[in-house]
């Protein structure tokens, strides 16, 4: 369990930060605050999650896509809030919390949007922590520069950078690849509209969104 004082501090920060669009995480026993993922980031993560759900359904995989904010409790000193996580259904998930108490209960795949002012933390510190905890793959989206940084921890460490125009191939889920520019909808819309738009687009142009090989 979390140290009582640290847990109370964390919950207090979360309550106060929610009204200010600030997210809270615990890193090495310290509360870290950052600007919450904005609307564009939420929409992109939602679309990626929708594509992943389709991939998992087609491949009949039992994994489950969770949309953030969701607490990922690595241990008593580290709690993260990924924007998107894929976990196995056997994992302990309740009350908006992924409780990691063993290797089989660690998210296999995590997606986050880069936070302003937290570049080193997101790109280095968190990437290392995820790898050590047993996460198989971590995608970090940079909306400003339009790049995606991928970190794979299967069979050694693999780091790559992709533009939004390039196909990104997952190493955690063989056969899954996507191109961000092909799934974005520049005119905006609600999350439900985006999901309907994506599924319609996939039926009309099945090669443009998700590819299974």
Task: Cite the ranges covered by each PLM segment.
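Gly/Pro/Ser/Thr-rich low-complexity, intrinsically disordered segments predominantly at protein N-termini
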Residues: 1-213
């Amino acid at each position: 369990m979390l140290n009582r004082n640290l847990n109370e501090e964390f919950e207090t920060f979360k309550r106060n930060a929610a009204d200010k669009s600030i997210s809270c995480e615990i890193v090495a026993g310290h509360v870290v605050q950052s600007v919450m993922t904005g609307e564009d980031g939420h929409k992109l993560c939602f679309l990626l999650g929708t594509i992943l759900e389709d991939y998992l359904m087609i491949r009949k995989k039992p994994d489950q896509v969770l949309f953030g904010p969701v607490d990922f409790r690595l241990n008593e000193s580290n709690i993260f809030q990924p924007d998107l996580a894929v976990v196995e259904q056997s994992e302990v998930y309740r009350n908006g919390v992924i409780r990691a108490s063993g290797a089989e209960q660690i998210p296999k795949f995590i997606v986050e949007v880069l936070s302003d002012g937290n570049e080193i933390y997101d790109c280095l510190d968190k990437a290392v922590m995820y790898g050590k905890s047993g996460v198989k793959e971590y995608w970090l989206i940079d909306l400003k520069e339009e790049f995606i940084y991928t970190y794979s921890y299967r069979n050694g460490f693999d780091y790559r950078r992709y533009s939004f125009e390039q196909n990104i191939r997952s190493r955690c889920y063989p056969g899954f690849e996507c191109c961000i520019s092909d799934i974005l909808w520049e005119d905006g819309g609600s999350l439900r509209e985006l999901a309907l738009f994506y599924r319609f687009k996939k039926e009309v142009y099945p090669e443009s969104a998700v590819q299974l090989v």
